[in-house]
Curated annotation (Swiss-Prot):
Keywords: Isomerase, tRNA processing. One of its GO terms (molecular function) is tRNA pseudouridine(13) synthase activity. Signal peptide: none annotated. Responsible for synthesis of pseudouridine from uracil-13 in transfer RNAs. Pfam families: TruD (PF01142). NCBIfam families: PRK00984.1-4, tRNA_TruD_broad. This is tRNA pseudouridine synthase D. GO terms for biological process: tRNA pseudouridine synthesis. It is an enzyme of class 5 (isomerase).
Amino acid sequence: MDLTRQGWLHGQPTASGVLKSTPEDFVVIEDLGYSPDGDGEQLLVRVRKQGCNTRFVAEALAKFAGIPARDVSFAGMKDRHAVTEQWFCLRLPGKVTPDLNAFQLEGVEVLESARHRRKLRIGALQGNAFTLVLRQVSDRDAVEQRLQLITAVGVPNYFGSQRFGHDGNNLKLAQRWAADEIRVRERSKRSFILSAARSAMFNQVVSDRLAQQGSLCRVLAGDALQLTGRGSWFVAETAEMDSLQQRVDNNELRITAPLPGSGEWGTRDDALSFEQQSLAHEGALIALMERERVDAARRAMLVIPRELRWRWADDATLEMSFWLPAGSFATSVVRELIVTQSSSNEADE
């Protein structure tokens, strides 16, 4: 599977630029979508961090609170080479709330904390707000045109390269695991590897759909359609194709692609045939998902950034902000704008 083979919705960018020349050029703020309950056995802690990864902070919080590392959870991994505001959840049944003013960790600041009744689980976010700075942008006019297109039409909802590990190593491990060349016993490592494989297969289907149709909004018979912003889906019936196409055009519905696993794909007819053909050479990876009892799921192929705003600090420096639903990647927005030149700071999560 070629991770570099990902099509563009608006054509390959002609402009180039630099992302993450400094951590301050990439700011992420988690949006839980709710306020803490104010009571309960869980303690929600919001921190601002820079220069350290999510698991490192979670382990430090566990040590500070005197609890096992497994009793600290979070909704998602955040890049160490960025400024991020992130929530952690400490399970403290019958325990006194620790004085987090005394918590010290280089690059980390505790912003607030409150009791809550439910554990914070992976993916349990409404979304993330991003503020980015692109530097050394080579063609302001071309980028401006693409910003208008992205505002109106959106971008492919690809998983970003950080999902696959450095140089795609997580996917390579998945392929070796699927071929019975290695065994993976560590639970967290298994999760990363399986996630990388599913994400790569999703990206492949999206890219193939773009190559065939030039669009991610043209409904096929049997497509699995999702209410925009919702997780559940239903199958497009042939008799309803015209009305469903209109709802997709109006951004009420999104066409989905598979996150392969055990269970049905969720599509039928033409859509199912297309997905099976797209992943025809990935039988070993799909079998691995089934063997490891990873539930099949669906994910929207298109995402439209909300509240997309931008300003030019000068002709080569673009400041932009936008909001994406949980699981969508800011780097997938940027790749439709510019060809990113290498910087010294690359994502590791």
